[in-house]
């Protein structure tokens, strides 16, 4: 089954996330890169396509700055996950889209006020919300779990 992932924000972190997801997922993905900058979208898509050996779809969505638009709504309707790589102040807005369009949600922000607002939104969500998944502790926890699972499989612990 193809997992469709919307990445909000196509700056350095968003483009890196897109490349990693496309190249290293153990399942098939379609990546939707969203940003308010057409130039960021162009650069991010180019980076992903040039540096990935996979052939899965990478689409770009020009996002509205303060609201949604038809392209965003169409992408949200089709996506399973919203990975929020947008500036922290945008996180509650992205989380609201995840609730409204029944997408799972993960964000990287460590902004306390925004995280508290997202926790309130997540209480009514029908999907999973994973907050503060940035480098530390987020990525470190994912990496540690992966290493643990490999160790467990190899040594039967």
How would you name each of these model-derived features?
Residues 85-87, 97-115:
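ADP-ribose/adenylate-binding Rossmann-like module
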Residues 51-67:
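Rossmann-fold cofactor-recognition segment
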Residues 127-157:
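Rossmann-like dinucleotide-binding core of oxidoreductases
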Residues 108-129:
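Rossmann-fold NAD(P)-binding glycine/threonine-rich loop
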Residues 5-11:
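Conserved N-terminal Rossmann-fold NAD(P)-binding element of oxidoreductases
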Residues 36-40:
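Helix N-cap at the beta1-alpha1 junction of Rossmann-like dinucleotide-binding domains, i.e.
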Residues 14-15:
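N-terminal Rossmann-fold NAD(P) dinucleotide-binding loop
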Residues 65-77:
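Conserved Rossmann-fold cofactor-binding substructure of NAD(P)-dependent oxidoreductases
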